[in-house]
Amino acid sequence: KIDPTKKYVNNHYHPKEAEFISINQYFIDKKVNYSAIGMQAHMQTDYGVLSETDLWNLLEDYSKFEKEIHFTEITVTSSKRFKDWEEHKIYLKKRDDLRNQGKDLNLESLDEYEIYQADYLRDFFTLAFSHPDLTSITIWNLTDLNAWRGHAGGILDKELNPKKSFYALKKLIKEDWSTKTEIIQKVKKPIVFNGFYGDYLGEVTIDGIKYNFSFNHSAGNNEAIKVIIQ
């Protein structure tokens, strides 16, 4: 029984697999009621890193289903990457053996990889954000402390200090993708501007008196937005 107030995501850890495309096509054909396609991208090996072409083609492959696309888990590590899955498995087995002995094995964040992590996440978010069907990106680890598989995949370090990637994403989200505008307009005339989706706070001055207002601009809304000033 489907709860219409919930958003259901068909999620897979390896979206490059043709089987996942087939599963989504099967769901569409059978009229399964779900909202979004979820995919994971844990880039802990050189082989697993998505190039710009890989990322765009992936989004295009799934856009034909006319569903929201979510990156439900992404990891871009600032620690050493492994060549491929076989090399990665050797490390994971060694780590598991140590953890079974009450010890631990974590990969240290490296300066050169912190620069790479910041640059890659900035480019990944920028390209993904530009695709009209992409609606959500979730970074799998906020901090390097107890990060998955011991990789330094957070945007905060083990002491919860911001890494370069934190500042790169902060600039994108809080500056580049925020709308700030100042308009001189006649009373009773509509205000027209281009802006990103989201919540807006505004201030209008009429006859020297300042009034505040707020509104939400969301996808799919093509009507004029009415606001109340107070």
Give the positions of each predicted feature.
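Distinct, well-ordered alpha-helical segments
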Residues: 15-30, 49-59
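The substrate-binding groove and active-site-proximal loops of carbohydrate-active enzymes
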Residues: 11-14, 40-49, 106-116, 156
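Aromatic-rich peripheral "rim/lid" segments of glycoside hydrolase catalytic domains that contact
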Residues: 54-66, 77-230
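Sec/Tat-exported extracytoplasmic proteins
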Residues: 3, 12, 41, 132, ...
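Aromatic-lined carbohydrate-recognition surfaces of secreted/lumenal glycan-active proteins
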Residues: 1-20, 67-80, 135-144
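Short helix-capping and hinge/turn segments at secondary-structure transitions, especially at repeat
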Residues: 29-32, 63-68
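Short helix-capping segments at alpha-helix termini
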Residues: 2-6, 29-33, 131-133
